[in-house]
From Swiss-Prot:
Keyword tags: CF(0), Hydrogen ion transport, Hydrolase, Ion transport, Membrane, Mitochondrion, Mitochondrion inner membrane, Transport
Subunit structure: F-type ATPases have 2 components, CF(1) - the catalytic core - and CF(0) - the membrane proton channel. CF(0) seems to have nine subunits: a, b, c, d, e, f, g, F6 and 8 (or A6L).
Keyword Transport: yes
Function, in words: Mitochondrial membrane ATP synthase (F(1)F(0) ATP synthase or Complex V) produces ATP from ADP in the presence of a proton gradient across the membrane which is generated by electron transport complexes of the respiratory chain. F-type ATPases consist of two structural domains, F(1) - containing the extramembraneous catalytic core, and F(0) - containing the membrane proton channel, linked together by a central stalk and a peripheral stalk. During catalysis, ATP synthesis in the catalytic domain of F(1) is coupled via a rotary mechanism of the central stalk subunits to proton translocation.
InterPro entries per UniProt: ATP_synth_F0_dsu_mt, ATP_synth_F0_dsu_sf_mt
Protein name, UniProt field: ATP synthase subunit d, mitochondrial
Cell compartments where the protein resides: Mitochondrion; Mitochondrion inner membrane
One function term, GO molecular function aspect: zinc ion binding
GO biological process: proton motive force-driven ATP synthesis
Gene Ontology CC: one annotated term: mitochondrial inner membrane
Amino acid sequence: MSGAGKKIADVAFKASRTIDWDGMAKVLVTDEARREFSNLRRAFDEVNTQLQTKFSQEPEPIDWDYYRKGIGAGIVDKYKEAYDSIEIPKYVDKVTPEYKPKFDALLVELKEAEQKSLKESERLEKEIADVQEISKKLSTMTADEYFEKHPELKKKFDDEIRNDNWGY
């Protein structure tokens, strides 16, 4: 197998291990989306299987002696010479170096956004827990107990009352 074909097969194999198919399937809502998703997965598996089997194998060496017996040796020698002179060009990747810095910068930005999102999620979860706690105790809670948890609100109400601005 040529170096480029083997590299493609290796990349596809690694990609198949890192794809969270079950996680993506859980996100789908409609039946049509599930059908399309299963078609995508089946197509990916077929292509990946082909890459792993068909393109990852080395070609069998040609038995030139066998052909010399059945065909004239001169013709076989010319074919062998032509076969040996064939050079398969190596793929030189010119695109990846161009986009790698941009991709790395996006990864850094992604990590920062992820951290920010996790902090915001944590804050919101705490806020939800507080609201749930208050909603459970609301029917039996006194104003003093509520103001104990929220002193800034008590100060605001006291200022309004002091200024004869009763809730307006």
